[in-house]
Amino acid sequence: MKLTGAEILCESLTKLGVRHIFGYPGGAILPVYDALGKSKLHHILVRHEQGATHMADGYARASGGVGVAMATSGPGATNMVTGIATAMLDSSPVVCITGQVSSKLLGSDAFQEIDITGITMPITKHNVVVSRAEDIARTVREAFVIANSGRPGPVLVDITKDAQQASCDFNWEASTPKLPPKRQRINYEPADFERAVELLNNAKRPLILAGHGIMVSGAMRVFDQFVHAGNLPVAMTLLGIGCFPASDPLNLGMMGMHGEAWVNHAIQEADLLIAVGMRFDDRVTGDLRTYAKEARKIHIEIDRSEINKNVKVDAALIGDAREVLEQLLPRLEHRERGDWLGHIRELKGDSAVKDIQGLPDNGHLTPRTSSTISGKKPVAKPSWSPTLASTRCGKRSITTTISRARW
């Protein structure tokens, strides 16, 4: 079946399960927009290309799939940079498709030509220029695999205008990705695993630092089992909020700069920190010279480059959070930890953020403990649910994340 490169792109996205695309048209991407009208894809027109990447990022986070954004060459592509960087830093699977000048004009400083692959190299997992219609299907398939594998992140596919306009035979089955062998999802030595087990079972004052990686890996259920099997208190990063029910007594809430002081004090007094899917960001640790000096540290992290980057750890378990926790769970010994948990309650005292377990159904709320959405009654005891909460940045996001009802 002969199709144009633009039609092949639309057909490939449809076969990959894409339903929505966020984009803004322009000269170098117009052939794709012509093809979109004949496809099953729903295009959402944005007012600025930066919005397209942010919307694709949000769509990926909300749906659990890959978000797709589209723009033209030059200023259209450069306008996407902030959204791409956000997706990279927050490990969000986004595929950005940009138009490019015709291949014969590459390198000539043609109208709206820009080296967008060079610009985005530091903020993408992978990017590529496609100058032949025959390569579009395979490249798009590769982009989706890369964006959604390992530590998720953005991929940019830059397609020249002549590749969009050219026609060729389309064979989806033959367009298999040419990628290196898949890495193991667990990649650590048995000695590291045994060291982690020993530290876990010998700790008197353990504390879990829960991050976004728990949700990315779909580890919420096994994480819940792991926490209760070891009776382990949990502090969360901002992006980790939602990985563990706020109604659980072992949930301490958010740590770090915008968290509660008593949570940070508990971290400083712990003798073991178990970091799961988090990167010891400066908003979490503060001054590294004084951060949890008495604590041994276990780091469960899929990205090897994050190990010992900010904080030196005693045991590194490199791999998918869900699979690592599934291996650790049978080896974890239960402890009552009455003294340690009691001490944490004493540290908490009359904190401004109260336990969600004691929240009255119609209690009065302050800005600091606000948990309403559109003026509705506060949610008293949320647990596992598909509820999603979204805020603007700045103070609104912080007051929401430290509120009684955590999402």
Task: Enumerate the predicted regions with their spans.
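N-terminal alpha/beta PP-like core and its mobile active-site loop of ThDP/TPP-dependent enzymes
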Residues: 1-338, 353, 373, 377-383, ...
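Active-site diphosphate/adenylate-binding microenvironment
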Residues: 9, 32-34, 348-407
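Internal, active-site/partner-interface "lid" segment
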Residues: 338-352
